[in-house]
UniProtKB/Swiss-Prot annotation:
Region (Disordered): 1-33
Protein's recorded name: Large ribosomal subunit protein eL21
Source species: Methanopyrus kandleri (strain AV19 / DSM 6324 / JCM 9639 / NBRC 100938)
InterPro entries: Ribosomal_eL21, Ribosomal_eL21_arc, Ribosomal_eL21_CS, Ribosomal_eL21_sf, Translation_prot_SH3-like_sf
UniProt xrefs under PROSITE patterns: RIBOSOMAL_L21E
Gene of this entry: rpl21e
Basic residues: compositionally biased ranges: 1-21
Membership in a protein family: Belongs to the eukaryotic ribosomal protein eL21 family.
Pfam families registered for this protein in UniProt: Ribosomal_L21e
Single GO MF descriptor: structural constituent of ribosome
Coiled coil spans: none
GO terms under biological process: translation
């Protein structure tokens, strides 16, 4: 019998993988992006940046920025019927595209 692994990155073999052409250092753009309170953002984990990484279970979720904590943003999401607040670095966030109103 083997003990089950329970680490932070366990069972994320495909989720936290970069494609071969994306490997290496990440561009500086996502590190310097700014978000405003109330703005909707997608949580998309950059596996090459370990600081400020949310738990992989929240990869792909959409939330709302409610504040800042140092360099990080506090993002409110709904998980089941509960609201949760995640502390996430901007490298792991993408702004939600707003549909153009005509």
């Amino acid at each position: 019998m083997v003990r089950r692994s329970k680490g932070f990155r366990s069972r994320t073999r495909k989720k936290l993988r970069k494609k071969p052409r994306e490997r290496g250092l990440s561009p500086l753009g996502p590190m310097t992006q700014e978000f405003e309170e109330g703005q909707k953002v997608h949580i998309v984990i950059d596996p090459s940046v370990h600081k400020g990484m949310p738990h992989p279970r929240y990869h792909g979720r959409t939330g709302e920025v409610v504040g800042r904590q140092g360099r990080a943003y506090i993002v409110k999401i709904r998980d089941g019927g509960k609201e949760k607040k995640l502390i996430v670095y901007p490298e792991h966030l993408k702004p939600q595209e707003q549909p153009e109103l005509q």
